[in-house]
Structures are given as C-alpha cells and as structure tokens.
Amino acid sequence: MIGVVFLHEISIPKNQNSFLTLHGFTNIDLPMQQSIDLLRRKLGEIYPPGEIIGFTRMIFESLCGYTPTDILLHKDTILSEDIHRKIERITDRLSQQEPIQYILGYTDFCGRRFDIAPGALIPRPETEELTRLVITENSGQPLRIADLGTGSGCIAVTLALSLPGSKVEAWDISTEALEIAQCNARKHNAHVNFFQRDILRYDVSE
C-alpha cells in the first residue's frame, strides 16, 4: 500500500467575543427582503459583497431550507418572528467576525456536510483541492493514510469513503476535536481509527 500523511496547520482558535443584541426589526411580520437588507447594512463595511451573498445563501438554507433560486424568486415571503430574530443574532456574530461555519455549526467539504465547532479548524479551499487530487490520482487503489491534526475529520472521512479498502488513521491532541471528528465519521458511516496523540512529541520509531 502507498502511504499518505496529512499534516495540518497547528493553531489555537481565538476566543470569540460575546455578541451584542441588534435592534434591526421593529415588527414581527416582515418579508425576507428586509432580513437580506439587514445583512447588507450591518455587514457591508466589514465584508465584500460576494461574501455577504454567500452568507445570505448559507443562512437561509440553514434556517429555512431555501435554495439560492428560492431567495431570488420569493423575497416577499413573510418570515416568522423566530426566524427574523435568529438572523439578527447571526448577523451580530458575523459583525464580530466570527466564522459563519462556527455560527451555523457545519461546513461543506468535497460534497459532504460536516459538523464543525471552534474546537476544530475550518478546512480551507486548498485543503479540499488537495483531498480531491489524492482521490483522483489514487482511484481504486487502497492507501495507508495518516491524517495528523485531523480537526473535524473531514479529510480522513472523505478519503475513507472515496478510497475503499484504505486504512485510515486520524490523530489529534484535542479531545474536543476528536469528538467532532468521531461524530462526523459516524454520521457518514466511515471507518476511521482515531487516536489522541501529540504529533510534536510522538516517537515515529514506535
């Protein structure tokens, strides 16, 4: 078997600031467009327009199950007070530059949805590209894979599912990260062996 080792960037997430309460709505029966306007107004000086569009799509998909087409065609849809308040809270947290993935509790990776929390780093686009490259170049060939600093487990789970017969190990020093990764493995029915290890102190000769 060919061996593949992933070594992740090691960092400690910053503590998130407690969020403020917004007062963008005065009525309980408001159309979706007013929530979209709130996002643009509160976040326009912090994020570029394209990123705000991405936030809007993710928020309405998560809270309402709406597709981008739904958002475009049904902006006059009346949303419940509960939905409006949730959007207010999400917008406030975004204004504090908290990642949208941590706010919503998930991230998409290689066509699958993974649970995510501040105890695990959010995978970068280049990480997804590298994972797809490994899959493409080793299609049908089982590998021995070590995902070091696995975080959410998205790489380990994706490779275990995409390269059948591979032996996949996932290491992390963080108990919280391993719990998230194991949850994702169960969610996707992927066979991955998890270990709590400090890769900076581990003796590779063992």
Language model features with spans:
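N-terminal auxiliary segments of SAM/dcSAM-dependent transferases
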Residues: 28-104
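SAM-dependent Rossmann-like transferase core, predominantly class I methyltransferases
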Residues: 85-163, 168-183, 194-203
